[in-house]
Amino acid sequence: GRASEVLYYDARGNEQAQRAKAVIVCGNGAETPRLLLMSASDQQPDGLANSSGFVGRNLMFNNHAFVNAVFEKPLNDYKGVQVTRIIHDFYENDEARGFYGGGGIDVRALWSATPILHSELGMPPDVPSWGAAWKDEIAHNFTRQLSIVGGTTSLALDSNNITLDPENTDEHGRPSIRVTYLDHDDDLAMAQFLEDRAMELAEAAGAVKAWRGGVGPTTWSAHLLGTCRMGDDPATSVVDRDHRSHDVPNLFVCDGSSFVTSGRGQPTMTIMALAFRAADRIKAAAAAGDI
């Protein structure tokens, strides 16, 4: 079947319907599978576009390691471009490490992008969260601090997924998201490797103080990937190489959920590139009467 309309809630909380010749879903790796799973019907009882059973599966969080460093003189890293320095020396997999994975290291303001963010997430572990010492640290170190960030592999695991919560609902009574996630041991080992290299870089650069963010189970992410994977085989993927659903020919998914692997760094530019590519393919299909 084909998608014919989208139901949504307006600003007053009233349900509305929008007819459409084509539907493009861009809700990221969490809200996109949630929407498709909530759109189950008699024709597609396991969720819209989910004949493969892969909607919501293989969630990837884009693993990272962090080191913060303070220097003697101001860096003013909060000004201008956020990321200007990138290292790819450790990008490729190296069997000599004893685990799978790779990644890049970039240097950026990150927690020192704004004073408020710095006070929340950029403080050294020995500084209290309030009082004179807290104020002194912000006043002196905000312009002198930078973060060294290692972006590494997050392996696609069938056990990591987005499902509909059977108990909790949102304000409209719709099922909330349930997230199930546990890092692969190799992902954590690679993150530890990059954290160690980041500490070496901070020390070699002359940091007067440096501390680790700490490597452990991933409990948050800005990058939600993999839950509506792209592929040629409808039995093992949700969308084809043009981001078109295998099951619903006028439904497209254009966000990080189409990733089959996490990559080894920031995914945003890849998501943007795929979105431009998908737009060209959708335009061509529409012109050919194929939507």
Question: Which positions does each model-derived feature cover?
Answer:
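A conserved FAD-binding loop/helix module that cradles the flavin
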Residues: 261-282
